[in-house]
Amino acid sequence: MAKREHQDQTGDSRPSKKSKGTKDTKKNTEVSPPYFQSPALDNVPQTEIDKFLSDHSIKITDASADKPSLRPIISFSFLPPSNKDLYAPLDGFASPTAIQSATWPLLFAGRDVIGIAETGSGKTLAFGLPCLKKVLDLKTKQKSCRPLAVVISPTRELAMQIYDQLVKFAEKVDIQVACIFGGVKKDEQREALKSAAVVVATPGRLKDLQNDGSLDLGRVKYLVLDEADRMLDKGFEQDIKDIISPMPVSKRQTVMFTATWPPIVRNLASTFMTSPVTVTIGGDPSADPRANSRIKQVVEVVKPHEKEQRLVQILNRHQRGTPDKVLAFCLYKKEAMRVERLLRTKGFKVAGIHGDLSQQERFRSLEAFKSGAATVLVATDVAARGLDIPHVKLVVNVTFPLTVEDYVHRIGRTGRAGADGHAITLFTETDKAQSGALINVLKAANQEVPEALLKFGSTVKKKQHDAYGAFFKDVEPGKAATKIVFDD
């Protein structure tokens, strides 16, 4: 019975041998071969599939079908056939993550996909492996400065991280990947683009190279918008539209990954995607922000002048013996610089990352922290989204961020890839406007709410806008003004 249900769900994932589509695929190198679901996956009992979806809180919404069309790939052994070397780096992993399991079959089948999941859930491989397989399957000769796949990321650090992960797989099958971002000279990037089939880039630099003729996006068959909500928050909406405009529509597969699902992100998806399947891991993404339940959250209410002394005490406790990696967040660049200097005078191995540092200095700080040369990284929110720094045992919020969403993103640097995490937040009276929202996050994750925090009140104050009031997030942003110059 389970097998029959599966056949109903898979639709055209198993075309007949007489299918003309198969013959056309051989002739047309611009089209990927169809996705064939593993026979071994066919034989998995439906009850086991249902349990997997339930245990991982996976919701799949497909407007073009009544039910999810394909079964999740719950084991690496169920991956579709490809160059065996492409999958070789997976030997270091036990099993796919929830977002990988749910999105892989859809992406391998060529569907447009919206993935909504917390950071640290394995999203890079979720879109990265199908990307590389598609490039292999197309079997087209690479043309200079005309990539087949583009991944757009909001920050340089995240772009570098995506690049590093993709290269581990791409180099096994001789696929060239280029990483493009601002803050460095363009000449080396132009040279890398000549042989790159896959380009990972930030919107600003990608648009620059596109505008000056260094890059032709007319052959792109696979487009990824990673951390889409973050890119829109940073004001890149028009840049993204300009970048996508010359890309082919009919033969392009578009993938969007996001941690939240506000109206502005939904509008972007409706503009550039074709009948997308939405895969949600966890609760309602449009609801209040929720923290990773594996993270132990501790909130300490302190006086503003006590914060730095308390930070030193916390670090002394966590840096004994085998020192833990600790990520300390500050709100402002000057504050981060001051805290970094303080910790260095106290004998801690510390590095910093914030907007005043050059690109090379930021690289060095991240590498020092990743390698263990520095065990404390002091950062502003530039590092709060997307960075996958392994084995961060503790996040300390020296100063509470401007929004509770940023709080959730900050503490998401720990407790990644299934590990447990720990976050300590130093909360002061100046942060009391955020107390209600923070209390809700703590309660939703079954964390202790200190009495001192409750005294600030549990009311959640809605964000206000001068023109739109409390409903500004649901209002379509106005079109940017055009500068008009009149003759004398």
Curated annotation (Swiss-Prot):
Single GO BP term: rRNA processing
Disordered: annotated span: 1-42
Amino acids binding ATP: 117-124
Its EC number(s): 3.6.4.13
Group of enzyme by EC: hydrolase
Record protein name field: ATP-dependent RNA helicase dbp3
Motif stretch (Q motif): 92-100
Catalysed reactions listed for this entry: ATP + H2O = ADP + phosphate + H(+)
Ranges where the Helicase ATP-binding domain occurs: 104-279
Organism this protein belongs to: Emericella nidulans (strain FGSC A4 / ATCC 38163 / CBS 112.46 / NRRL 194 / M139) (Aspergillus nidulans)
Gene Ontology cellular component terms for the protein in this record: nucleolus
Domain note: The Q motif is unique to and characteristic of the DEAD box family of RNA helicases and controls ATP binding and hydrolysis.
Keyword annotations of the record: ATP-binding, Helicase, Hydrolase, Nucleotide-binding, Nucleus, Ribosome biogenesis, RNA-binding, rRNA processing
Role this protein plays: ATP-dependent RNA helicase required for 60S ribosomal subunit synthesis. Involved in efficient pre-rRNA processing, predominantly at site A3, which is necessary for the normal formation of 25S and 5.8S rRNAs.
Tagged with keyword Ubl conjugation: no
GO molecular function: ATP binding; ATP hydrolysis activity; mRNA binding; RNA helicase activity
Lineage of the species this protein comes from: Eukaryota, Fungi, Dikarya, Ascomycota, Pezizomycotina
